[in-house]
């Protein structure tokens, strides 16, 4: 991924804001592909950057990649565009409830990373769309290693939903850059 990543880093300063004054970068791809790791690396390159994780926007396993989530994403980015502020209520997976609302001024760069971040509901707000690919068995192994064995029971259904979502949304095809997450992430 290093040569492609270098190309992406070189293009970052020339990106034009499409969401108010914020340059939105989406990082999508299958579970366990390395989206969060890439977001962290890019955030280090970008002064004035805030990252929203899709995991904070799902409200448990039953509300991933739903029309309700698409509406929530649209509302978040409309507020960034029109009111120059980031506002959302993150989900607490350990307690299975919502945490207090996060409300802060919009940043110069805003990264949205996670499964579903490149969907059509918010594509018009994004200045750069990235896709990271990974083989299903590698991605699943990483997810279980990262999140623990308790998530294994939810993954078969999530992986099916994720596949259907990606096919419907043509997320990979519409990405500006496609990266391989096969290596160590």
Label the predicted regions.
Residues 149-185:
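Small-molecule kinase domains that catalyze NTP-dependent phosphoryl transfer to phosphate-bearing small molecules
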Residues 58-110:
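Conserved nucleotide-sensing/catalytic segment adjacent to the nucleotide-binding pocket
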Residues 38:
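Hydrophobic positions on the alpha1 helix immediately C-terminal to the Walker A/P-loop
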